[in-house]
Amino acid sequence: MVSRRVHTLLEQLRAQGIKDEQVLDALAAVPREKFIDEAFEHKAWDNIALPIGQGQTISQPYMVARMTELLELTPQSRVLEIGTGSGYQTAILAHLVQHVCSVERIKGLQWQARRRLKQLDLHNVSTRHGDGWQGWQARAPFDAIIVTAAPPEIPTALMTQLDEGGILVLPVGEEHQFLKRVRRRGGEFIIDTVEAVRFVPLVKGELA
């Protein structure tokens, strides 16, 4: 039985066009308040982005649901996340697939996310401190790749790490950003523009 606040959020997401009930079930199952600072805990189930420190944010639940839905996941999907951040999106993915690989460039955020995921008994996640622009070649190919920060253009390394039929979902742009979905078919990449968005930039390199 979900709380009234969770139920209200799920109804808002349905009204905004989220149709995948498995995605909505995952959002209901993951306690968002565990991934934010206590000062913002009263806003945990509001449909807004919140700061998590280091100049980063936890995405609004609508955007988490939308991007996850666009990945067209199955339980067997091999998933790569670029930008672990708080670990919230990671936890949603971990509820939907057998294993998630996640790369975070900021060491402190990676450590905090790993701790939160373990506290929630989500052990089907591998995290790595590294440059998200490069993906995770050693674990490729992936059926789905999700990027939670915006590069100015689609990183070539991420497209090449998609398996045949795989889907990459990411925000792209600088001043004006758009959510894109890239699907690999044979030797081609089919790119669709979904909607206008606003994300923090995907910065190259890594931080200790």
Swiss-Prot record:
One Pfam family, short name: PCMT
GO molecular function: protein-L-isoaspartate (D-aspartate) O-methyltransferase activity
Localization, UniProt: Cytoplasm
Classification via SUPFAM superfamilies: S-adenosyl-L-methionine-dependent methyltransferases
EC number(s) given by UniProt: 2.1.1.77
UniProt keyword Iron, yes or no: no
Active site: S59
Keywords per UniProt: Cytoplasm, Methyltransferase, S-adenosyl-L-methionine, Transferase
Top enzyme class: transferase
Swiss-Prot/TrEMBL catalytic activity: [protein]-L-isoaspartate + S-adenosyl-L-methionine = [protein]-L-isoaspartate alpha-methyl ester + S-adenosyl-L-homocysteine
GO biological process per UniProt: methylation; protein modification process; protein repair
CC annotations in GO: cytoplasm
Family: Belongs to the methyltransferase superfamily. L-isoaspartyl/D-aspartyl protein methyltransferase family.
HAMAP family: PIMT (MF_00090)
Free-text function comment from the UniProt entry: Catalyzes the methyl esterification of L-isoaspartyl residues in peptides and proteins that result from spontaneous decomposition of normal L-aspartyl and L-asparaginyl residues. It plays a role in the repair and/or degradation of damaged proteins.
Protein name per Swiss-Prot or TrEMBL: Protein-L-isoaspartate O-methyltransferase
Organism: Citrobacter koseri (strain ATCC BAA-895 / CDC 4225-83 / SGSC4696)
Gene this protein is translated from: pcm
